[in-house]
Swiss-Prot record:
It is an enzyme of class 2 (transferase). Its EC number is 2.1.1.199. It catalyses: cytidine(1402) in 16S rRNA + S-adenosyl-L-methionine = N(4)-methylcytidine(1402) in 16S rRNA + S-adenosyl-L-homocysteine + H(+). Belongs to the methyltransferase superfamily. RsmH family. This is Ribosomal RNA small subunit methyltransferase H. Specifically methylates the N4 position of cytidine in position 1402 (C1402) of 16S rRNA. GO terms for biological process: rRNA base methylation. Coiled coil: none annotated. It comes from Oenococcus oeni (strain ATCC BAA-331 / PSU-1). The lineage of its organism: Bacteria, Bacillati, Bacillota, Bacilli, Lactobacillales.
Amino acid sequence: MTADYGHVTVFLRQAVENLAVKTNGIYVDATLGGGGHTDLLLKKALHGHVYSFDQDENAIDFNKKRFSKEISEGRLSLIHSNFQNLIKELNLLKVFAIDGIVFDLGVSSPQFDDEKRGFSYRSDARLDMRMDQSQSLDAYQIVNTWEYKDLASIINRYGEEKFASSIARKIIKRREVQPIITTEELVETIKEALPDKILHKKGHPAKKTFQAIRIAVNDELNVLQEALKQASQLLNSGGRISVITFQSLEDRIVKHFFNQLATKNQLPSKLPVPDKFIQEEFKLLTKHPLIPSVEEIEENHRAHSAKLRVLEKN
């Protein structure tokens, strides 16, 4: 069954416009989802080709129907794969360089809203959280088999949760009696580990822990670093990378990676080399990230934490 992909894409226009799309260019949508960015890329690259990746089979199935015309015309290729396989998958299709790529990170609304996927702390389902449902590691395994130190480590590192140790201890204690099978059972366990003052604060008390487990299940941060590296290697001169993030861990990785590339070839200021001879390979097009307008946040509450960063290859 395909999920309902009728959701609002954050930074839809800005993410694609910042790629400065050429009509005959080669572009990649690294996170197909509901096809919002792919649709806009197709409208702008009328004589080019778009390659769209998603590891979620539901997204591929949905978009095969949505873009059946563009696929049959040979303007769009849908690739059922994780974006850490960019170079491998594109090379198989005889594509060795691209003019731009857009990443829309995090869980897509349909994944989050589909209760059976086990992503949400607001509905009850079996613990899962796999973006690629063919992989074996899921949230149930992490919660019920990982050692205390590993649980505490990911909750602290990926969830930035200061009560990580207490939550990990409570998980271990509860699963010794019986397995923690559902999202609701995990939420109850997390709440039991937190002090009352935290439970009465704004925001869901399980949000940080669920984020941490989801990141661990999908190895999101390592995958992101690898994908950014590959994307930068694929770019033609003048090609751009446009990345939308929704949480600080991802944004830090993107910011650091972009800054690293943009300053890579800068020489120490004391060296007597004229500026005209110093040529950076990449340049930042967003010294500060773009953030959503009030209207976008009102239209889509998940947009409030979104940031857009753009890098260009010289």
